[in-house]
Amino acid sequence: VIDFPISNMSNSGIDHIQVYIRRKPQSLTAHLGTGRHYNINSKSGNLQILYSGLGMNMSLYNNDIASYIENLEYIEQQLEEYVVIAPSYMIYTQDYNKLLNTHIESGADITLLYHSVDNAKEYFLNCYAINLNKQKGVLSLEQNHGNTKNKNIFMDTYIMKKDLFIELIHKSRKTSSVYTLLDIVNASCEDLDIRGVSHRGYFAAISDFNSYYESNLSLTDIKTAQNLFV
């Protein structure tokens, strides 16, 4: 599944990619290799695998913010003005360069990608949903409890300036050791201009075995597969 976000980034012209993982990286390192098969192994680009060495067995504290804190120097070293953050458990195709342009043109502080679904009662129960105003400004993020069928499922994909990203990392750690990036972004909805952009095309969230099975089954349909691969 991790091949999809990396391919999206590579196909969007992003050649500095950092992969953050929660557990020991041997198997993932072997799978990703140098990144050559993603067309990012060039003189100017690289693929880094980073993780939090502290609290490896303390899953509550070993979250994305913990990994960012421990590898902050690698983030600060990057010369790019913007960061694109994407999940490893969601399957979709997206031109991040186009999404970045939309973000810049909007003047927003943060842009979040979401997918509108009409089956949220049965699916995406481990995901978060975005509550939007009429101008697609993000009011809040809340876990999908399956109470309604129509939801804007947050695709765990963010775009923001690198400096703001670093600021949120520090703010999150000061607030709580268990805070995630999603938590601090959600807490910042009133203070920052956070906007949602709707995704079109195939979308699946692989959060358990059933969702893995369902997504594979859906891709046996030619029209469905074309929405992802064409």
Residue map of PLM features:
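Acidic metal-phosphate-binding loop of nucleotide-sugar-dependent transferases
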Residues: Y89-I91
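Conserved core of the sugar-phosphate nucleotidyltransferase
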Residues: T93-L168
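Anion (oxyanion) recognition and catalysis
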Residues: S10, I104, C189-E190
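Left-handed beta-helix
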Residues: D163, K171-V230
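Conserved N-terminal catalytic core of the sugar/cofactor nucleotidyltransferase
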Residues: V1-Y82, K98
